[in-house]
Amino acid sequence: HRDLHSFPTRRSSDLDYYVDNAEEMKGKWGEAFADNSRPLYLELGCGKGGFAAQHALKYPDINIIAADIKADMLAVGRRTVENMFAAVGRTHDNIILLRINIVNISQLFAENDKVDRIYINFCNPWNRGKHNKRRLTHPRQLEQYKNILKTGGELRFKTDDDELFEDSVEYFKECGWEITYITRDLHSEDFPDNLVTEHERMFAEEGKKIKYLSALPPVKSK
């Protein structure tokens, strides 16, 4: 992939959109997109990229970074993005695939990089006790997310796993986040902003209820 030091302010259609040198992008994330005046969203644990690709196509006026630690997943994600965009004749100029360890996510964004929204969709539940701290909704992660969200920015969390969801609700409360919307059966509600991926459809067809919440981080004291 191309060295991102060479990213122009506006991205040409042939420029690579896969990033694995995230540390070098701190303070320069806007430069990775064709139009850095758009809102910036971040999906954590993007897997095969289906959600992020759908989002980028449906909302061309929003930039989205789709992050995962697994290179093999992101390789599938690249094909997903390319195929979905090619099918409608669009250039993928509002999506970046990012390979990172999300444990250190807050170290990769500067003040001018803050994001408007974070998505966490169907992440590994890590339900065995000693592994709970690996959860993307664990309090130590929520502490980082509040530092990279803009004022008024929100986090949206979706899962099919009951234990992860109930524990996460407690995590958000413990960390002072305000839960603004919550449902334990998303598909039974009229929620127009929901993008349904193949993953989510599969769970629903198996009879699993999809749990969802939106939350705002605690207001920082001045």
Question: Locations of the language-model features?
Answer:
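Short, small-residue-biased leader/transition segments that mark boundaries at the very start
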Residues: 1-12
